[in-house]
């Protein structure tokens, strides 16, 4: 009966598509990016050839100079104001000359990816908007314009309702992970076992409030995680953003049988009442708890932005602070848990994940968790038509206890500490672990020229200096102290890039 019902439904959908085809309005848009990068010391290695391989960073090995391209194509099928469907493809990133991604001579690489695919519809006789499918989901942020907890594409059902011009409501259910570990698994010759609980489900509610000169959005999010979500064969895999951001990095003997519950809450907003003066803030809290308490993670992150818009540009001051690990590895981590921060951080486009195009970025990490910082910027400075410049200077440091540095090393299973290294399996390390004795300085200049309405040329240059404390109270007792002293005492990374983009922005 179920099969017959399925066939009937499919036939009805096909018939509807056939009879209503003339009423569908198809709209296409896209983005073409050509990028040319040159940089050195992406892993902060010194200049000696033996310790420096191109622009290695975050486990990626790149040449000092590389040319890259990416194409994004979006197709919208609009039946009415109440019903539409969208599919969004991405081709790339393709490194010129790289056969694995279709950039070598002859091309013909199989490198087309599905980025988003969803339908939008409205509940009849109401203003309730529903989006179902793989879509972009982001928690709110008024300072960085990119959530440090969740900002990425994910399979979800989202609801949006506007009560009046001042009050709205947004809710979603998202499933970032499921069925990645398999239903039957055998590890190291042991007896095969079944594994059904490898999913992660997130539920969130946001309440956007907008008044004259003031916007505030309080929000909450809960996530349930199955014990099979962190299976051993997924360590360091491409989907492992959650394993880096949701665990402490330490674990005991029952880590693979630990159900998890996570909770986040935040208040973000801005005041533009005294325009052109603007104040923006983000306050976020999060915790992730497991049956294995060593895996727990709990912390908060707050940021503040002050800026004043002038005719020629917008100068601004900003700062942030995030809790870091204390000196006890057995009580979990005091860093705020994160799911995937894949947005464009306005505070930094080199140290963190902030560049809107293809670029070398997140050299310190994809999020600001476990760090503090202050910065100044001149944004969108323009003295010539269609030419803009943005200058950033950031000074930052870590908030993790110096004692924790000795755990950033390899690990012998089930040693007397009963904990794994903070970098175990790629967990909890994104990618540089900064203590309260470690500091970094970033200087960046971004130049954009709008040559035509849909064609922009960008020239971007950035420099990052890192100082790690190699005394015995911090990294000197680390098992890798010789390695860190050679590579991080102190050193710098830098890049320069030129990019061209033609688009209706996707």
Region locations from a protein language model:
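Active-site-adjacent helical/loop segments in soluble small-molecule enzymes
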Residues: 354
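Beta-barrel outer-membrane channel/assembly domains of diderm bacteria
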Residues: 2-137, 157-171, 198, 205-214, ...
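Long, hydrophobic, well-ordered secondary-structure blocks that form the structural core
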Residues: 148-151
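Glycine- and aromatic-enriched membrane alpha-helices
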Residues: 349-350
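Long, well-ordered mid-to-C-terminal structural blocks that present hydrophobic/aromatic surfaces
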Residues: 294-342
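Outer-membrane beta-barrel translocator/channel fold
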Residues: 175-191, 196, 214, 219-236, ...
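A conserved hydrophobic secondary-structure block that centers on an alpha-helix together
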Residues: 142-144
